[in-house]
Amino acid sequence: MRYTFFRFLLAAALLGPVATTATRAAEVVELRQPNAAKVVVKLQFRNGSAADPVGKEGLTYLTSQLVTEGGTKDLTSAQLKDLLYPMAARYYATTDKEVTTFTFEFHKDFIDKFYPVLRGLMLTPSFTQEDFDRLKSNQLNYVEQVIRASSDEDYSKFALEDQLFRGSRYQHMTRGTAAGVKSITLADVKQYYATAFGTDNLTIGLAGNYPASFAKQLEADLKKLPKSSVKTPIPVAAMPNGIHVEIISKPDALGSAVYAGFPIKTTRADDDFAALMVANSWLGEHRKSYGKLYDKIRTTRSMNYGDYSYIEWYEAGGSNMLPVPGVPRHANYASLWLRPVQIAEGLRKQYPSELGDLKVGHAPFALRLAVREMDNVVKNGLSKEDFERTRTFLRSYVKLYGTTPAKQLGFLLDSRFYGRKNWLQDVDAQLAKLTLDDVNRAMRKHWQVQNMFVTIVTDDSEAQPLADVLKNNTPSPMSYANVVKAGLPKEVVAEDAEVANYKLNVTEVKVINTNDTFR
């Protein structure tokens, strides 16, 4: 009876209020591909985790997951899996700070069979207590345990955003906080879905081989969604006075994961972004070995697995080789990602006779080297040769961003978010007409190294010695085994000495217990 009553209320909401106020129709973006075998539907709502109610951090994520991981009024989640298996269809939801996107992919021959599933999930989701309890438990486990244990790299990135956006609705992870997730009830989810996912904050995307009648039916059915009363606030990232460092101390960390960043006032909506793409690619293109950071830290000194730079949020950098759509943001920042470097305890065990007295590991040296490289390129600019080579690479590389219909459609939806028609086409044209002066001017305008936030996730044995070195700007010589040191080129030895004494504008250092994060 309780669920039947809820479905009646939700259905009434989805049919829309009996009022004279017109609701904005959802924008429709189509990418017709007559030779494609697959159909892709993306429903992007302009509400993300930043729209989570205060005290309910994680509600947007949990709601979206309950839609796609639950059932409909006619079919349970288990029945849906059995129904869809022969179709090889799939669907999922992603939530970022400002948007939530539902993606449906299926073969064109199954349009008639699959569409009732899509319609049922979006218009009459079952929202059962059983599904809610299961998904809430998984989400809480991630916030309380998984993020701290599975990847110190992701941990450091989310902790940096906690610093950058502290006090704003961007601060918490998309999955929320421990207290926020614990407080969410099934009633919260039902109410939030009925008020936050509306036709007036929706962009409908279709790609592939589908009849015009399908597009019309989809648009007509989604008009039954109510008008949204939830708006996502757009914060401004804080600019610190100096370099603020937060060191997260955790037991049994095998290295120091470093992530640093500062706000920038440019996004894909701005033409300056293309110029920064060239500078960023030269400094540290994601998962590419030719970047300056990678060359200096990994290739030359074998300090870690890789080092990269960014001019916008990069989703799941540990697994994605190329940028993915679905994470557009208005509040932006530049960042440096240094994959974990060795701590003193590990180096002492590895080289007891040579480094037995070592007090701190490689993190201070790596941070200094990375910041110094950014500092140098801002001051000195790119050379003509580096500019031409990097721009040529990027004009080819961005064409790989949309290698599937789903990605192509996703980038088209993101383009609308930024006020553009087709960003992938726009950026190629922008790169084509860029000059070296454009790039060097953009770096001087948007990049600097005097004010930034730094997050380091490290072992509890390393945290305080590391904090002391950074707070006091103590020189941090690179630590090599004797056999490695003996074979170093003279130019590397000379550069090491300069890096070890490079002054960071550190004005604040805090050590935080891992149990006190994301509460």
Q: Can you say where each PLM-predicted feature lies in the sequence?
A:
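Sec/Tat signal peptide C-region and signal peptidase I cleavage site
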Residues: 18-25
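A short, acidic, amphipathic alpha-helical segment used as a generic capping/interface helix at domain edges
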Residues: 433-442, 446
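M16 family metallopeptidases and their MPP-like homologs
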Residues: 31, 36-62, 68, 76-123, ...
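Bacterial N-terminal signal peptides
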Residues: 7-18
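An aromatic/glycine/proline-enriched structural segment found at the starts
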Residues: 166, 199, 203-266, 458-462, ...
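Positively charged n-region of N-terminal signal peptides that target proteins for export
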Residues: 1-7
